[in-house]
Amino acid sequence: MNEIVALMIICPLMVMVGLGMGFALLWLQQQA
């Protein structure tokens, strides 16, 4: 049960980090 809860918490965090990095790269490219 703990593994399921961990996945439910970690997966959204990984998605948020991925989106954040993607937007950051796009922003840096536009600023350059």
Curated annotation (Swiss-Prot):
Compartments, record wording: Plastid, Chloroplast thylakoid membrane
Superkingdom of the source species: Eukaryota
TM region positions: 4-24
GO biological process per UniProt: photosynthesis
One term under GO cellular component: chloroplast thylakoid membrane
Keyword match Lipoprotein: no
Keyword NAD among record annotations: no
Primary location class: plastid
Keywords on record: Chloroplast, Electron transport, Membrane, Photosynthesis, Plastid, Thylakoid, Transmembrane, Transmembrane helix, Transport
Membrane topology: Single-pass membrane protein
Family stated for the protein in its record: Belongs to the PetM family.
Assembly description: The 4 large subunits of the cytochrome b6-f complex are cytochrome b6, subunit IV (17 kDa polypeptide, PetD), cytochrome f and the Rieske protein, while the 4 small subunits are PetG, PetL, PetM and PetN. The complex functions as a dimer.
Function: Component of the cytochrome b6-f complex, which mediates electron transfer between photosystem II (PSII) and photosystem I (PSI), cyclic electron flow around PSI, and state transitions.
Name the record gives this protein: Cytochrome b6-f complex subunit 7
Organism in which the protein naturally occurs: Cyanidioschyzon merolae (strain NIES-3377 / 10D)
